[in-house]
Amino acid sequence: MVACVVKDWQGADSGEATLDLATAKPETASHIVHRALVRQLANARQGTVSTKTRAEVRGGGRKPWRQKGTGRARAGSIRSPLWRGGGVIFGPKPRDYSQKMNRKERRLALRTALMSRVEDLIVVQDFADHLPRPKTKELVTALQRWGIEPEQKVLLLAADITETVALSARNVPTLKLLRADQLNVFDLLYADRIVATTGAIAKIQEVYGD
């Protein structure tokens, strides 16, 4: 169990929140998180890249010149991979890159990744009421009050994302906004700091606390 100090909108301490998630054993933790990360990145690939072999390139059906007597190297097609404009040898073809991982393993990897980042976790009170209208500047200022540097990559977790919060956050290039039930390993590991509302912490405990 991890206890985190809760900050209010102004950055002052206002309470405490706890997070209790089961994680992988130390000797297998990095391996299972790595597998989950590789799976996520592989599943994001479209796999639509395609090249043409010598059989698929247009033309090349006629032998360019006779086999013997010209003094030139023998050639059977102008679409040989050795020729400019020829086919591609062993080039990529459309394929499915997706990888399978058991649900229990995926959830264990996610919990392990999150608990490994508790040193970079900042818990704040739900602040949707402090943004009655979209205002990027107010959200950026609040992040600074919570101890985040302007150049740091931030993952902001909320139980529910209101329209004003979404509009306030979408123009900040270093900020990624996610619902607490949409956690993924890549975003957890990519961010420099993780900001979670108290509602998000409760939601994470509810969804992932097996």
Swiss-Prot record:
Coiled-coil stretches noted in the UniProt entry, renumbered to this chain: none
GO terms (BP aspect): translation
Region (Disordered): 56-77
InterPro entries for this protein: Ribosomal_uL4, Ribosomal_uL4-like, Ribosomal_uL4_dom_sf
Source domain of life: Bacteria
Keyword Cell division: no
Cellular component terms (Gene Ontology): ribonucleoprotein complex; ribosome
GO molecular function, one term: rRNA binding
Compositional bias annotation for Basic residues: 60-71
Keywords, comma-separated and alphabetical: Ribonucleoprotein, Ribosomal protein, RNA-binding, rRNA-binding
Pfam families in the record: Ribosomal_L4
Family: Belongs to the universal ribosomal protein uL4 family.
HAMAP family hit by this protein: Ribosomal_uL4_B
Entry function: One of the primary rRNA binding proteins, this protein initially binds near the 5'-end of the 23S rRNA. It is important during the early stages of 50S assembly. It makes multiple contacts with different domains of the 23S rRNA in the assembled 50S subunit and ribosome.
Quaternary structure and partners: Part of the 50S ribosomal subunit.
Name listed for the protein in its UniProt record: Large ribosomal subunit protein uL4
Organism: Thermosynechococcus vestitus (strain NIES-2133 / IAM M-273 / BP-1)
Lineage: Bacteria, Bacillati, Cyanobacteriota, Cyanophyceae, Acaryochloridales
Gene behind the chain: rplD
